[in-house]
């Protein structure tokens, strides 16, 4: 490749997911690829301040931000702290108006606070018990791709999605 400046793409996985979800995606050589990982949220930290901390990991001018699901919400929040070339969201929403009925129900009722997220570490054992050895390949995929299992992080993430305030969004989001 000649001396052209490459555009950097930052990839943000969805809630509980590891950057390994992107491992089979190939990008043309004119792009520099950086995989973002979830960092532990501070106690009572808003998504606004979390995004500010995450934005400190971005060291390139006008990158492209790509986020999946909750990662799509986060890259939109990061873009409020960093000038970006483009935001691409996958299986995500652009504003709270687009949140699913179940998320809106959770916001109104607070039912999301009752989820037994401490069982997440036992998910493989539960699935193997219920479905038997035939589910082993799927369980191994869960271990590989859904590696963020800290119950406090998961509670924080769900709460941030349910209570996300964004109504107006960048019209250039893909």
Predicted regions and their residues:
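Active-site catalytic motif of lipid deacylating hydrolases and related acyltransferases
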Residues: 2-61, 109-120
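Conserved serine/cysteine hydrolase catalytic core
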Residues: 153-174
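Flexible "cap/lid" loop of the alpha/beta hydrolase fold
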Residues: 83-116, 162
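Active-site signature of alpha/beta-hydrolase-fold catalytic machinery across serine-
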Residues: 24, 77-78
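Short, conserved loop/helix-junction motifs that constitute active-site signature segments
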Residues: 2-4, 26-28, 81-82, 166-171
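Gly/Ala-rich beta-loop-alpha elbow adjacent to hydrolase catalytic centers
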Residues: 66-75
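Helix-loop "lid/cap" segments that line or gate small-molecule binding pockets
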Residues: 122-135, 145, 161
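Short hydrophobic segments within beta-strands
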Residues: 11-12, 66, 90
């Amino acid at each position: 490749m000649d001396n052209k400046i490459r555009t950097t793409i930052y990839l943000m996985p969805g809630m509980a997911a590891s950057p390994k979800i992107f491992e089979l995606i190939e990008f043309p050589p004119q792009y520099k690829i950086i995989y973002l990982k979830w960092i532990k949220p501070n106690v009572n930290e808003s998504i606004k301040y979390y995004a500010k901390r995450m934005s400190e990991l971005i060291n390139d001018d006008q990158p492209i931000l790509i986020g999946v699901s909750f990662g799509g919400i986060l890259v939109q929040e990061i873009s409020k702290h960093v000038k970006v070339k483009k935001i691409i969201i996958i299986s995500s929403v652009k504003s709270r108006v687009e949140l699913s009925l179940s998320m809106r129900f959770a916001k109104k009722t607070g039912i999301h606070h009752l989820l037994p997220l401490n069982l997440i570490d036992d998910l493989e054992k539960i699935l193997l018990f219920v479905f038997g050895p035939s589910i082993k390949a799927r369980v191994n995929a869960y271990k590989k791709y859904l590696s963020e299992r800290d119950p406090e992080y998961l509670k924080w993430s769900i709460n941030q999605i349910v209570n996300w305030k964004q109504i107006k969004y960048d019209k250039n989001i893909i």
